[in-house]
Amino acid sequence: MIAPLANSAVKPHKSASFVPRHVAIIMDGNGRWASARHLPRIAGHKKGADAVKTTVRAAAEMGIEVLTLYAFSSENWRRPASEVADLMGLLRLCLRQEMHNIKERGICLKVIGDYTRLDQDLVALLNQAIEITANNTRLTLVFALNYGAQDELVHVTKRIAEKAKEGQLDPENIDVGTIESLLYTHDLPPLDLVIRTSGEKRLSNFLLWQAAYAELLFIDTLWPDFGSETLKAAVEEYARRERRYGGL
């Protein structure tokens, strides 16, 4: 945990090795951004969608391999139905507008979480975007939709129990690799950096297993104000840290 990032100019990286392969962002602060401007919450979400576009572009330019965005948690269903509808409508609109741009820019789209609970037309749009971008390699963009880390671990536990019951897995052979092979993120590189905006300092049920040895960065910037310079500053901070993975 560090102090909020300064708004100073960012120096170029010395080497691509300083760039994290896998960055995840808890995009927080849309509502507060809107409230501060006496605007409806949907205005903050729309501005947040613009920040997503800017950040995806910046991540690709910086050489980040995977960008995972906490777009809609399994707990977000508790929000007012009108706000949930607005969020789903915004996601639907963005997918329709950006799907082919994403494909042309070499971005591969993936989704983690039980997104089949979303409206069926939205599920179809997501599946279409996943399919047409599957062979892209410039950047993998992962949306966490109807995602909760505790639900993910329950899902993994059930899968392991089923395999053991069917004789496909000896309980004595269950290890870290067994669990990781069944996570939603099993085909992604290890998580290097988690960024949370808006000043809140918690993970909110996001990638709890994957974040075991990730660097955590909490910044005061509200998500709608997040941009390429903010991401560069976060990567600069990551590059200054020494990752020990429990060692000395």
UniProtKB/Swiss-Prot annotation:
Stored InterPro entries: UPP_synth-like (IPR001441), UPP_synth-like_CS (IPR018520), UPP_synth-like_sf (IPR036424)
Cofactor: Mg(2+)
EC number per UniProt: 2.5.1.-
Enzyme class at the top of the EC tree: transferase
Residues noted as binding substrate in the record, renumbered to the chain: 29-33, 41, 45, 73-75, 77, 79, 196, 202-204
Biological process, per Gene Ontology: polyprenol biosynthetic process
Any Pfam family matching the protein: Prenyltransf
Cofactor binding summary note: Binds 2 magnesium ions per subunit.
GO cellular component: cytosol
Keywords: Magnesium, Metal-binding, Transferase
Domain of life: Bacteria
UniProt-annotated catalytic positions: 28, 76 (proton acceptor)
Binding positions (Mg(2+)): 28, 215
A GO term for molecular function: magnesium ion binding
Subunit structure as annotated in this protein's UniProt entry: Homodimer.
Family: Belongs to the UPP synthase family.
Role played: Catalyzes the condensation of isopentenyl diphosphate (IPP) with allylic pyrophosphates generating different type of terpenoids.
Protein name as it appears in the record: Isoprenyl transferase
Species for this entry: Zymomonas mobilis subsp. mobilis (strain ATCC 31821 / ZM4 / CP4)
